[in-house]
Every structure is written in C-alpha cells, then in structure tokens.
Amino acid sequence: MNSKSVSAILLFLLVAVLLGCAAQQKPATVAEPVAFPEGVADAKWGMQVKEVRGAVETFQDDTEKAPFALYASRKQFDLPAIVSYFFTPKSKKLYRIDVTFNDPGVYGVVKGNLAQLLKGPVFSQPDREVCLWKDNSVLILQKNPNSVQVSFSSGPLLKLNHEEEGEPVKATPPWPSLWRMIFEIP
C-alpha cells in the first residue's frame, strides 16, 4: 500500500471520527487549551531514542521495528501506569507518548489531573476527551473497558512521522491502543 493510500484512509477515518464526535459532543470550549506540554515526565518531544533511554528506565525496547517504541512502568498522577514512547521510523525522534492505567476506575482522577493542566476539551463524549492545538498537537483521554489511556502527540512531529512513512500504531502492549478504540479496529 503506498503512502497516498494510507494517507487517504487515515484522513477518512479521522473525518469519520470527528463527524461522529460533532454529532454527540458537548458544546466545544471556545478557548484553545493552554500550551501543549513539552513532553511527559523526563521525555521531551523530538528527543532521540538514546536520549529517552538515558532519561527513562524502560522494560522493553522495540525501537528497531514498527511501531518503534520504548515501554516503561512508572507512576503518573501518583498512579501506576505503562508509558509507551513512540519514535519516527527514520530520524528516531519522539513524537507520541501514551500513558495507560490498568484500571478504568481511575478515569475521574486522571481527568481531574488533566483538567488542572488544560482549559478543557475541544470534543467531549462519555469516557473520551480530546484537546487540539493549532500546531495539530493532540491529547486524547479515553476510558476503555479494562484501562484508561492518555495519548499525547506532537503535531509537528506527527507530520514528520507521516513524511518518514511511519506506520500508524496498531497496538500498545500490553493493552489495546487508544487508536484502535477510537477507530473501532478489531
């Protein structure tokens, strides 16, 4: 499949999701969220793989194969979590961080912590909040049947990932990825 086909499919899925959100959303917050975070914990956007390895204690390294990721176990918002760090395939720059909590009951706590950092979601549905920034950065908070996941993606680096023909992330070990839930991929 060539990159134009992949781009067309991703664009179609994004539009479909956003149209679905628009039909079910609460009124959108007028103000753009505060500045997009520079990273999560000790990892900052654009860091090289070896820099993240040096800053974060990881338990799994899949940076030589898709989805080009490092995995760590740590506390986020004083809750145990699995943190997945995703890198662009060629330049190996950090462009996305997923934080997964293995307890759907912590959704309110995580949402409350994020609310202290952000002005509010652009789209809101039951168990899903989406914040967008002008540079196409995005934060998605999602409650899944067995987990809660927060996905932070840097807009400029998402673009770089696409330019480097990076694959969309299909799964985040050890739980289903947020993108699979959003796009309802089996």
Regions found by a protein language model. Give the residues of each.
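Bacterial N-terminal signal peptides that target proteins for export
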Residues: 1-10
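C-terminal motif of bacterial Sec signal peptides marking the signal peptidase cleavage site
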Residues: 18-20
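Bacterial signal peptide processing site
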Residues: 22-24
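Non-cytosolic coordination micro-motifs
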Residues: 26-64, 98-186
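N-terminal, post-signal-peptide region of Sec/Tat-exported proteins
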Residues: 54-82
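Short beta-strand element of the conserved SAM-dependent methyltransferase core
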Residues: 69-73, 84-85, 131-133, 141
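Mid-chain, structured segments of secreted extracytoplasmic proteins
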Residues: 72-110
